[in-house]
From Swiss-Prot:
Its EC number is 3.4.21.-. Belongs to the peptidase S1 family. The active site is at 676 (charge relay system), 726 (charge relay system), 825 (charge relay system). This is Neurotrypsin. Disulfide bonds join 93-165, 109-149, 138-163, 195-259, 208-269, 239-249, 305-369, 318-379, 349-359, 412-475, 425-485, 455-465, 525-589, 538-599, 569-579, 619-750, 661-677, 765-831, 794-808, 821-850. Its main location: secreted. One of its GO terms (cellular component) is axon. Keywords: Disulfide bond, Glycoprotein, Hydrolase, Kringle, Protease, Repeat, Secreted, Serine protease, Signal. It is found in: Secreted.
Length: 875
C-alpha cells in the first residue's frame, strides 16, 4: 500500500480493514507458537482498555440514481424461452450487489457516460462497451476481473479504482431470531449502523427484501448504548419500499453529532403465514438471485425434492421472491445439500401461479428423496450480456439470443464452430451441445447483435470470446445461430475437456489448479498428484517446458467444490479430462490438499556466489511482493514476499527438526531472534538449525536451505525471569558472508537507526510467521498488517513491566484484534521506510494472554540495540 492510499484509508475510516483481520481471519489466528511453548511466562498477552477510540468518519455521500423499473409478470420471459447465465453475475459484483457505486477507498463513481475520452492512466480492458451508459454502478466489462469504476481525484483528474462488492451489504444483529435485529450496513471496509431518524416500514421492507426475508418489514429502534463501539453511517433513510437494495434509497450521510433519541434503526421482517404464501429463501448461491430453495414450515426450514422440478416451478419461486429476469431450475443439489426435513416433492407448477402453495404438489413432508436431490433456482437479472436459447421446446434448445441495451438480439453464424457451441452450453449449465438448423425455430425479428464470434473453448462466459463490436455484422436472420444443448452422460465427462486455470502463484505459470465444471470453479485433490499430472495441466495451458507438481495447498487453499480426486495421468494426455477415472465430485479431501503446479520449471536455485555482488550490499528489498489480488491481514503471504523471514528449528534424533521460533536474516551469516527462545533447550549450538527460504513447512522448495548454528549470542543483560533485553543473535555455519545463499527469496532485512522512534518514522508494518492459526499450525508463511501504538498507551497497560527497550503493537478493535500471537516468538515486526526498503523494528517478545481485549503484543525495540548488534556482527 502506498503512503497516499494509507492516509486516504485512514481519513475514510477504513484503517481497521487495512491493518487488521476481518472477523473470519480473527478466528484463524490466536497463538504465536507452532508447537507447545516452553515452561515460563506466556507471551504474548492482552489487557482490557477503558478508553473509547475516536469515531471513524463516514464515507462520502453516495450518488443517487433512479431504480430500474421492475419487470411485470407479463413482461417476464416465459420459462420455456429463457436460458441462464451461471455464476458469477455478468459484469457486476460477484456477491450479487449490483448497485455498488463507490470505490473500495470511498470515492464516488462517475457515470460511465461522463468519462472523458483522454485518461492519464489506462483502465482495464474492454471498458469502451460501457461508454455512454448513464449509470455509475461498478462493473467488470470483460466479465473476468474485479469490478471497478472511474472517479474524480483530488486534482480534478479522472482516475479509476476497484470496488468493494460488499459495500451496501446488510445484516441483522442482536435479535431473537434471523427475522429481526438491529440493521447493520457494510461501508468503507467495516460494519456500521443507521440512525433511526425518519426510519419507517418502507425502509424496513427494503432491508427484509434485500435479505430475502420477505417483502414486509416493520420498523423498530434499538438503543445505541447496547451496540458497543460501532460507527453510524447513514441517517434519514427515505425508501419507497420497492427498491431492491438499500443503496438505491435516498439517505443522508452521517456527519456526526447526536442521533435523535439515541436509537439505531432495527427491523422485524414479517411474513404472511397463511397457506397461500409460505416463507421461502434461496441459500448457497453466489448472489441473492440464486440458490437452493428452502421453505419455512412448522417452525423450521426445509428443502424441496427435485422430482419433476423444471423452469415453470422456478418461474413461480422467482415471482414469489420478487425477483425479475430469467428463471431456471437446478437439480441434484447444485447449490449444495441442505439440512433439516424435505418439505415438498412432485411440484408441478404451470408457471403462472403467484405462490408455490398454489401449484400441484405432494402433501407437506411426504417425499421419497434425500438432500442429494434438493431443488434450486436462479433468477438472473436482465443485464447486458445475459444469453438464452429461445423459440425451442425448452431452455436447452433454440435460437441463441444475447441481451443488450434493453433488447434481445441474435448472433450471426459466420465462422461458428463446435467450440463456440461448447462455451454457450457450458454457460447455460449443460455438458454437451451441437449447432442446430435455424429452420427448426421461429425466425427472430429483433436486432443482430454479434458476428464473427471465435471461442477457444476455455472461456467461462460467451462474451469472453473474440467478436465484432455490438451491432456490427453483414448477416440476415436466416444466418442466426441455433443450438441444442444436452445434460451429458452419467459421470459428467466432457469430450472437449474443461477450462483450467492457475491461481495465487507468483506469475501466470504457476498456482493452485482450478477447473470449471458444472458452472463452478473448483479444485483438485492432491491424492496421487505427480509431475505427470502437472505436465498435462501445463500442456493444456500451452506451456511446453518441464512441469512440477505441488501438493498440500502449496499455493493456498481454494474455495468452492473439490471437483476431482485421484487423477492418474501418464503425462501424454492432451487435457486433464483424459486422465480422470473417478466421477466428478467424488473425493475424500479438504482444501488443505488442493493440488498445484509450476510450469516451465527450469530450477531457480542460485549458486552461492552467482549473485553475491549484486545482492550482498542491499537490505530490506522485497523483489516479490506485488500481485493483483492483495492478501493481507493474516492470510498466506506471497511466496518469497518476506525474504528475510527464517525459522529457528530444534534438531531431533530423526533429523526432522521442528519449528521453535521465528527469526530475521540480517546478513548472509547473522540472524536476529528473541533470547527467550533458548530458555528451555539451552544455548548449545548442537541443538539448533536455521532454515532460510522456506514458505511451506512440509514441502521442500528450490530456495529452501537448512544451515547449522555456529554461535549463539544472548544479550548479557537478559534474565530468564524478565522480559527486558529479550534479544539474541545467531551466527550461521559457513565462511564469512557465504553462509546463506542470497536469491530473490533469501535477502537480509535492514536495521533501523539507533534510537529511531518508529512510531514517527515507520509505516505499513507487518508481522510474519508460521504460528498457530487457532485451528491448526500454519503450513505456509502467514502475514498480518499491524499498527504501532503510542508509548504512553503501552505504559498505562503494562505499568512498570514495559520499558524503553520495548514496543507494543496491535489492532485493539473488537473482532479485529491483531498482535504478535499471529507471528512466531522471535519473529520480525517489519515496517516500510520511504523508498520501499524494509527494516526490522521489533522482535516478537511477550504480552498478557493471546487475543485478549485491549492487550497489545510487546516487541523488543531493535533500534535500542543497534550498537550492540553491530558490535557483535561487525555489520
Amino acid at each position: 500500500m502506498t503512503l497516499a492510499r494509507f492516509v486516504l484509508a485512514l481519513v475514510l475510516g477504513a484503517l481497521p480493514e487495512v491493518v487488521g483481520f476481518d472477523s473470519v481471519l480473527n478466528d484463524s489466528f490466536h497463538h504465536r507458537h507452532r508447537h507447545s511453548p516452553p515452561p515460563g511466562p506466556q507471551y504474548p498477552y492482552y489487557l482490557p482498555t477503558h478508553q473509547r477510540p475516536p469515531r471513524t468518519r463516514p464515507p462520502p455521500p453516495l450518488p443517487r440514481f433512479p431504480r430500474p423499473p421492475r419487470a411485470l409478470p407479463a413482461q417476464r420471459p416465459h420459462a420455456l424461452q429463457a436460458g441462464h447465465t451461471p455464476r458469477p453475475h455478468p459484469w457486476g459484483c460477484p456477491a450479487g450487489e449490483l448497485w455498488v457505486s463507490v470505490t473500495d477507498f470511498g470515492a464516488p463513481c462517475l457515470r460511465w457516460a461522463e468519462v472523458p475520452p483522454f485518461l492519464e492512466r489506462s483502465p482495464p480492458a474492454n471498458w469502451a462497451q460501457l461508454r455512454g451508459q448513464r449509470h455509475n454502478f461498478c462493473r467488470s466489462p470483460d466479465g473476468t476481473g474485479r469490478p471497478w469504476c472511474f472517479y474524480g481525484d483530488a486534482r480534478g483528474k479522472v482516475d479509476w479504482g476497484y470496488c468493494d462488492c460488499r459495500h451496501g451489504s446488510v445484516r441483522l444483529r442482536g435479535g431473537k431470531n434471523e427475522f429481526e435485529g438491529t440493521v447493520e450496513v457494510y461501508a468503507s471496509g467495516a460494519w456500521g449502523t443507521v440512525c433511526s431518524s425518519h426510519w419507517d416500514d418502507s425502509d424496513a421492507s427494503v432491508i427484509c427484501h434485500q435479505l430475502q426475508l420477505g417483502g414486509k418489514g416493520i420498523a423498530k429502534q434499538t438503543p445505541f448504548s447496547g451496540l458497543g463501539l460501532i460507527p453510524i453511517y447513514w441517517s434519514n433513510v427515505r425508501c419507497r419500499g420497492d427498491e431492491e437494495n438499500i443503496l438505491l434509497c435516498e439517505k443522508d450521510i452521517w456527519q456526526g453529532g447526536v442521533c435523535p433519541q439515541k436509537m439505531a434503526a432495527a427491523v422485524t421482517c414479517s411474513f404472511s403465514r397463511g397457506p397461500a404464501f409460505p416463507i421461502i429463501r434461496l441459500v448457497g448461491g453466489s448472489s441473492v438471485h440464486e440458490g437452493r430453495v428452502e421453505l419455512y414450515h412448522a417452525g423450521q426450514w426445509g428443502t424441496i425434492c427435485d422430482d419433476q422440478w423444471d423452469d415453470a416451478d422456478a418461474e413461480v419461486i422467482c415471482r414469489q421472491l420478487g425477483l425479475s429476469g430469467i428463471a431456471k431450475a437446478w437439480h441434484q443439489a447444485y447449490f449444495g445439500e441442505g439440512s433439516g426435513p424435505v418439505m415438498l416433492d412432485e411440484v408441478r407448477c404451470t408457471g403462472n401461479e403467484l405462490s408455490i402453495e398454489q401449484c400441484p404438489k405432494s402433501s407437506w413432508g411426504e417425499h421419497n428423496c434425500g438432500h442429494k436431490e434438493d431443488a434450486g433456482v436462479s433468477c438472473t437479472p436482465l443485464t447486458d450480456g445475459v444469453i438464452r436459447l429461445a423459440g425451442g421446446k425448452g431452455s436447452h434448445e433454440g435460437r441463441l439470443e444475447v441481451y443488450y441495451r434493453g433488447q434481445w438480439g441474435t448472433v450471426c453464424d459466420d465462422g461458428w464452430t463446435e467450440l463456440n457451441t461448447y462455451v454457450v452450453c457450458r454457460q447455460l449449465g449443460f455438458k454437451y451441445g451441437k449447432q442446430a438448423s435455424a429452420n427448426h425455430f421461429e425466425e427472430s425479428t429483433g436486432p443482430i447483435w454479434l458476428d464473427d464470434v471465435s471461442c477457444s473453448g476455455k472461456e467461462t462466459r460467451f462474451l469472453q470470446c473474440s467478436r465484432r463490436q455490438w451491432g456490427q455484422h453483414d448477416c440476415s436472420h436466416h444466418e442466426d445461430v441455433s443450438i441444442a444443448c444436452y445434460p451429458g452422460s452419467e459421470g459428467h465427462r466432457l469430450s472437449l475437456g474443461f477450462p483450467v486455470r492457475l491461481m495465487d502463484g507468483e506469475n501466470k505459470k504457476e498456482g493452485r489448479v482450478e477447473v470449471f465444471i458444472n458452472g463452478q470453479w473448483g479444485t483438485i485433490c492432491d491424492d496421487g498428484w505427480t509431475d505427470k499430472d502437472a505436465a498435462v495441466i501445463c500442456r493444456q495451458l500451452g506451456y511446453k517446458g518441464p512441469a512440477r507438481a505441488r501438493t498440500m495447498a502449496y499455493f493456498g487453499e481454494g474455495k468452492g467444490p473439490i471437483h476431482v480426486d485421484n487423477v492418474k495421468c501418464t503425462g501424454n494426455e492432451r487435457s486433464l479430462a483424459d486422465c480422470i477415472k473417478q466421477d466428478i465430485g467424488r473425493h475424500n479431501c479438504r482444501h488443505s490438499e488442493d493440488a498445484g503446479v509450476i510450469c516451465d520449471y527450469f530450477g531457480k536455485k542460485a549458486s552461492g556466489n552467482s549473485n553475491k555482488e549484486s545482492l550482498s550490499s542491499v537490505c530490506g528489498l522485497r523483489l516479490l511482493h506485488r500481485r493483483q489480488k492483495r492478501i493481507i491481514g493474516g492470510k498466506n503471504s506471497l511466496r518469497g514476499g518476506w525474504p528475510w523471514q527464517v525459522s529457528l528449528r530444534l534438531k531431533s534424533s530423526h533429523g526432522d527438526g521442528r519449528l521453535l521460533c521465528g527469526a530475521t536474516l540480517l546478513s548472509s551469516c547473522w540472524v536476529l531472534t528473541a533470547a527467550h527462545c533458548f530458555k528451555r533447550y539451552g544455548n548449545s549450538t548442537r541443538n539448533y538449525a536455521v532454515r532460510v527460504g522456506d514458505y511451506h513447512t512440509l514441502v521442500p522448495e528450490e530456495f529452501e536451505e537448512e544451515i547449522g548454528v555456529q554461535q549463539i549470542v544472548i544479550h548479557r543483560e537478559y534474565r530468564p525471569d524478565s522480559s527486558d533485553y529479550d534479544i539474541a543473535l545467531v551466527r550461521l555455519q559457513g565462511p564469512e558472508e557465504q553462509c546463506a545463499r542470497f536469491s530473490s527469496h533469501v535477502l537480509p532485512a535492514c536495521l533501523p537507526f539507533w534510537r529511531e522512534r518508529p512510531q514517527k518514522t515507520a509505516s505499513n508494518c507487518y508481522i510474519t510467521g508460521w504460528g498457530d492459526t487457532g485451528r491448526a499450525y500454519s503450513r505456509t508463511l502467514q502475514q498480518a498488517a499491524i499498527p504501532l501504538l503510542p508509548k504512553r498507551f503501552c505504559e498505562e497497560r503494562y505499568k512498570g513491566r514495559f520499558t524503553g527497550r520495548m514496543l507494543c503493537a496491535g489492532n485493539l478493535h473488537e473482532h479485529k484484534r491483531v498482535d504478535s500471537c499471529q507471528g512466531d516468538s522471535g519473529g520480525p515486526l517489519m515496517c516500510e521506510r520511504p523508498g520501499e526498503s524494509w527494516a526490522v523494528y521489533g522482535v516478537t517478545s511477550w504480552g498478557y494472554g493471546c487475543g485478549v481485549k485491549d492487550s497489545p503484543g510487546v516487541y523488543t525495540k531493535v533500534s535500542a540495540f543497534v550498537p550492540w548488534i553491530k558490535s557483535v556482527t561487525k555489520l
